[in-house]
Amino acid sequence: VVLRISHALNGNAFAYNQDFTINGVTNYFTRLQYYLSGISIHHDGGQITPLNNVYVLASGHIKSYYLGSYTFNQVESISFDVGVDQAANAGNTVNYPSHHPLGPQSPPMDWGWPSGYFFVVSDGFTDSNNDGTPNAPFSLQALGNQMLTSIDPISVNPTSSNDTIYVDLIANADKFLHGLDLDAIGVDHSSSPSNLAMCNNALNMSVFEAGFINTSIENEPSRNFVHVDYTLPYAPTFNYHFNSTNQINLDIYGVDGKHIIHHSNLPHEGSYFPLKEFSSGIYILSLSNGKDKITKKYTVTQ
């Protein structure tokens, strides 16, 4: 079973640095991540199967999330919690491998312990002077067990291919921020009422709904992108997406042309964090799937 989440802004396909309007104000995201836990699949005439110990770390630029192998014939609906259940939130990232959603992440998805995981992270810029251009940074990162928000079962119309069931949801990312004065909030990494409202908006504002956004035809390069996340300026993370499902080759060069890193057979969408430590400077990132190629200049600041 694969959960496919099409993230949206004002009904259009999600993109970082893309303007959207909420509360009558123009904003854009530079980072959007959140956890899903307590997932249950309703199937085959009303049976309910909880997906125990299955966690999703969703990101605005990633669509597909593998939930596991099950003997379902017909999936009827899906329910889940936004955030991490209390038992897991009392754990620690060191208890999981790096590829696990609850394992160490870059940028971090936790505040250490006992504080626990960030349930929802919304970073970006908002228009503070009403000129239509987002200029003031905001960063809401919600933590605390009280942030856990249960989403009622969502009826779905899954598709099947090669013994895989695809469950399609739309996540209206802008609705996470409904009713929040982002300029006044600024930076808030806590269990505050603002962060609680952001998490509760997942239910109250129906952030999640059944369906998908048909952004473009397969292999169309116009939907390919890479976004550099500078949350850690000394160790940027690369969020990327290619519309084709071909595997990706990644290369990093110095501005002098020296080849520093090569990584092959990466998935067509994801986040890449170089394990190598880089000195301050300018670097060139290259991503290619054999047909389409993206190059991006970025900086490291130690």
Show where each model-derived region lies.
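Short beta-strand segments within Ig-like beta-sandwich modules, predominantly Fibronectin type-III
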Residues: 57, 263-268
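A glycine-anchored, Pro-Gly-centered beta-turn/N-cap motif
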Residues: 71-78, 269, 279-284
